[in-house]
Regions:
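A recurrent flexible, glycine/aromatic-enriched loop bordering the glycosyltransferase active site
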Residues: 1-12, 29-33
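Substrate-positioning beta->alpha
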Residues: 13-16, 34-38
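Short, well-ordered alpha-helical scaffold segment located
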Residues: 15-20, 56
Length: 157
């Protein structure tokens, strides 16, 4: 049983989905996170997501997505999306606390990620530099989303 799932290989009980009034949120359609929000709402409404190890998915990954700049943009985008999903799931009264927690967490990640990137570069350790760059990118996404930004059109259908 899982709390969230990607939608590239998702079978749904449409009767349940319709009974509880769930729909994919189009505001997340081109930015990513639509499947995360939907499946989190599905579980919150009492739905169950099960993993099927035998399911096969073929997902073509263009060579351009194997480059460091794309991967860092993706990390920033995913981090921002996680905050946007939390805000969408929360009631209006909970949003200020979520935004404050996200802003603080984003700032910490930016500082630690920047330091780790610098240290990794100075000592010639690409692993530490890469992990620092990833943490820095995620921090930027979290901080941006905490203030209402961070939206990146991941998928232009």
């Amino acid at each position: 049983v899982r709390p969230v799932a990607a939608s590239n290989c998702l079978l749904l009980d449409l009767g349940f989905v319709r009974r509880v009034g769930l729909r994919f949120d189009e505001a997340f359609g081109a930015t990513g996170g639509e499947d995360t929000l939907f499946t989190r709402q599905l579980c919150a409404a009492g739905g169950v997501i099960r993993w099927c190890a035998e399911a096969r998915v073929r997902d073509h990954v263009p060579a351009s997505r194997l480059a460091r700049p794309w991967i860092l943009r993706r990390q920033r985008s995913h981090a921002a999306t996680s905050v946007r999903v939390e805000l969408a799931l929360a009631g209006g009264g909970a949003q200020p606390a979520i935004r404050a927690r996200a802003a603080a967490g984003g700032l910490v990640r930016i500082v630690v990620g920047g330091l780790r990137t610098a240290c990794g570069t100075l000592i010639g350790d690409p692993r530490h530099a890469a992990k620092g760059a990833r943490l820095l990118a995620r921090g930027r996404g979290i901080l941006a989303a905490s203030t209402g930004g961070g939206v990146h059109r991941e998928y232009d259908h």
